[in-house]
């Protein structure tokens, strides 16, 4: 049990044994021994959680203020930032602050926020405004597509418009102050819904006042509004990036040597090499936004390469960008198919990928940079070498941000604003990448995250960093994310991997293994790689289908496509087996 030492457990067991020896000598106990023993066992089970509870909880016994934060961040980040900010608040304000972390994945947090805001606004709508709660209100208050009249227009409001306007004008809250960690896409969605705000009702506290107080932080040389096609902060000041991250490949050098692969992977297409069969660790994109983002960026890299090829070809006809996007999409889908065919299985959590690679259960996999670096450190040998490695595919990934934003109706807007200011300050930025034990660094373990402020990367700071050679600018220059190419197809990427790879994985792997053993006979290979059902045009139609949010139609289409690919893989297997 956490918080209870072995001597304490031994003493507890000895005491209970002595009590039992005395108790069982009582005449009534000797007569009803079995029944009383059963009752006693039940009581012990019920009392154990209280007897063996940790000596200390995460909350202080007494506190003056409480800051509630939704976050997907792991315990190391929560500990370092919670500890450092609470100390700063105590030193400056003389108050004990309790940082109350509410931990879940970003998709779960999104569901909780929508559900909680719906319940909170329903109370406000029915009790404060005395309006009936209607289905139109429930679906409109947080819907950014509900258009409101422009200032000066006198047109009457519909029920949907009234609900939307009242919500945006309100200070309805859910008892949570901040959303900290995740991806910019998640924050853009919450900001559009109206759940994230630039300032509280008074206008005194929030990110907007912080930006006004520190304009030097929000300059191109520090935190640019966008870089490499990725937004670094919201133009309406509802969220801002706090640290940087990119996607890449983690790999195990020992496993590569066992497989006879001398060259370490450096690009996404390396994971499609047949020599990696059964040795790639992947997560299900339908349960991992990280892997979906990696696949999207893989596709964009193929698009950019196809566009460049057509622009450099003097005989190429048509619009290079339009045709390049379509060709690149097809190439990207083929590469995803090969990487999937090489995978052992699809795990349900992206964090398991570097764990499996570090343990030697897989040769390589896709992961976020800081997970790759962390596991590389965990298995580092005394001589400084490590069987684990991580590489960012240059030109194949962007440098995105992990943001923070204040929620509408935050109970402690002053503390929330101070926390955001702290995270962006020199003190907060040092926590992300300074080595433990250095001045301003974390006290327990390195966080291995890259600070968002580009002005942070100077010689003085690099001397204390765990990743002194990191260069966010180089990564950003090598890859430009074009949201207009694939942003609207993000859900389609998840969908196509499900029907083409996850649901059909057994048949896909079986066919791929046979193709490898027969040295890829042309006819069988062509059948295996036939992805016309998921070409760029059909992807647009799938996007329209997913936009309707009709689960029955989605399931029906998924079944249709899964059956088609399963039959296709079985046919490819048989053709390859027969040498065709």
Question: Which ranges hold each PLM region?
Answer:
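Short loop->beta-strand "edge-of-pocket" segments that line small-molecule binding or catalytic clefts
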Residues: 68, 269-290, 298-302, 320-324
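Periplasmic-binding protein-like
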Residues: 212, 222, 245, 282-283, 314-315, 422-449, ...
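A bilobed periplasmic-binding-protein/Venus flytrap-type ligand-binding module shared by bacterial periplasmic
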Residues: 250-255, 399-414, 431-432
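Ligand-binding pocket segment of bilobal, Venus flytrap-like solute-binding proteins
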Residues: 293-384, 430-431
């Amino acid at each position: 049990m956490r918080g209870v030492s072995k001597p304490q457990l031994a003493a507890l067991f000895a005491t209970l044994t002595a009590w039992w020896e005395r108790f069982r000598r009582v005449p009534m106990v000797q007569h009803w021994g079995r029944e009383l023993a059963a009752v006693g066992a039940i009581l012990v089970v019920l009392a154990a959680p209280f007897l063996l509870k940790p000596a200390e909880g995460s909350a202080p016994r007494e506190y003056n203020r409480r800051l509630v934060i939704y976050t997907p961040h792991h315990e190391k980040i929560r500990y370092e930032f919670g500890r450092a900010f609470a100390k700063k608040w105590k030193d400056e304000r003389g108050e004990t602050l309790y940082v109350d972390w509410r931990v879940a994945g970003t998709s779960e947090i999104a569901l909780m926020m929508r559900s909680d805001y719906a319940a909170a606004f329903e109370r406000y709508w029915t009790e404060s405004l005395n309006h009936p709660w209607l289905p139109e209100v429930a679906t409109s208050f947080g819907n950014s597509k509900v258009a409101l009249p422009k200032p000066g227009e006198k047109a009457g409001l519909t029920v949907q418009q009234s609900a939307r306007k009242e919500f945006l004008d309100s200070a309805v809250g859910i008892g949570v102050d901040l959303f900290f960690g995740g991806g910019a896409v998640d924050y853009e969605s919450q900001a559009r819904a109206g759940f994230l705000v630039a300032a509280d009702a008074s206008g005194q506290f929030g990110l907007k006042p912080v930006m006004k107080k520190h304009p030097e932080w929000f300059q191109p040389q520090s935190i640019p509004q966008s870089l490499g096609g990725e937004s670094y902060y919201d133009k309406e000041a509802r969220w801002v990036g706090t640290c940087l991250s990119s996607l890449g490949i983690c790999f195990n050098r020992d496993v590569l040597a066992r497989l006879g692969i001398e060259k370490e992977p450096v690009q996404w297409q390396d994971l499609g090499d047949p020599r990696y069969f059964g040795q790639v660790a992947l997560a299900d994109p339908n349960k991992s936004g990280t892997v979906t983002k990696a696949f999207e960026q893989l596709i964009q890299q193929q698009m950019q390469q196809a566009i460049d090829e057509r622009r450099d070809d003097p005989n190429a006809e048509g619009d290079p960008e339009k045709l390049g996007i379509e060709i690149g999409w097809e190439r990207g889908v083929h590469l995803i198919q090969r990487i999937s065919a090489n995978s052992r299985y699809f795990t349900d959590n992206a964090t398991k990928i570097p764990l499996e690679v570090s343990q030697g259960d897989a040769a390589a996999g896709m992961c976020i940079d800081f997970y790759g670096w962390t596991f590389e450190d965990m298995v580092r040998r005394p001589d400084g070498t490590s069987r684990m490695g991580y590489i960012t595919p240059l030109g194949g990934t962007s440098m995105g941000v992990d943001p923070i934003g204040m929620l509408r109706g935050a109970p402690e807007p002053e503390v929330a604003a101070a926390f955001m200011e702290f995270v962006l300050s020199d003190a907060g930025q040092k926590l992300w990448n300074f080595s433990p034990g250095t001045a301003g660094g974390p006290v327990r373990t390195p966080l291995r995250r890259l600070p968002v402020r580009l002005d942070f990367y100077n010689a003085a700071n690099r001397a204390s960093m765990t990743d002194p050679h990191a260069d966010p600018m180089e990564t950003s220059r090598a890859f430009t994310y074009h949201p207009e190419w694939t942003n609207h197809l993000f859900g389609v990427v998840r969908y196509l991997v499900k029907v083409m790879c996850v649901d059909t994985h057994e048949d896909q792997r079986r066919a791929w293994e046979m193709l490898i053993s027969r040295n890829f006979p042309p006819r069988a290979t062509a059948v295996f790689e036939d992805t016309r059902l998921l070409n760029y045009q059909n992807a647009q139609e799938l996007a329209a289908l997913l936009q309707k949010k009709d689960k029955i139609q989605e399931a029906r289409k998924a079944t249709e496509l899964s059956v088609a690919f399963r039959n296709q893989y079985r046919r490819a297997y048989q053709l390859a087996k027969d040498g065709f």
